[in-house]
Amino acid sequence: MSGQELLTFVVYDIEDDRIRARIANACKDYGLERIQYSAFSGPLSATMRGELIARLGDTLGDEVGKILVLPVCEKDLQARREMLNAPPEPGGSRG
């Protein structure tokens, strides 16, 4: 990430399948990667983030739903904690 970009998370809860797909496509168009079913992340400049926010707002329109766009600074990113309990590999053991 360049000094001008911040890691940006987009998380959404949208009932309409068509609108939800268009939101996902918009995130992909801006180079974000899917991290959960309804969550994307990736580096965005303030300008690109503003454009994406406008596009997401236009896409949601008056439909029922919620979209959170969350830029994260490097300091906060370094303080993150991840917890992962992955399922066992098929045919493997949990030794």
What positions do the PLM features span?
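Basic nucleic-acid-binding interfaces
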Residues: S2-F9, I14-G95
